[in-house]
Amino acid sequence: MSESEYVFTVFKRHWKTLIKWLLHITGLPEITVDELFERVNSDQPPLMIDIRSAEDFNGTGYSTYGHIPNARSIDILQLESSIEDLQPFKDKEIVTMCPGGGLSLAAVEILTEAGFKDVKSLKGGIGLWRKKGYPTTTS
């Protein structure tokens, strides 16, 4: 799938959430990059789900900086079909992330509707995480 087809498919599926994000009216839970940095270094870090493409996650696509260490790669287009694999985390803290913090709100909606209890979006996304100088990796 080309990058433009990918973007169109994602927008077609999640346009309502993206519009709400643009208007700042989502009402969905978010976590700041500073809060996540503290949580990542705690005794019980959250499950981090990076919803970008595998290429962006690995630093070989549009985003060349990779991902937050210990984040799990699940493309937004595959998230619904991955719900079963995520069941062990149903009652645990989960943080979803994307480049800017908008599309990860759609992931929060998907997981919340599937019964997950503590799901938040990374406010400002991986772009803000990187801008603040927090670590990323391509491995």
Stretches with model-predicted labels:
Residues 61-77:
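A short alpha/beta connector and helix-capping loop motif
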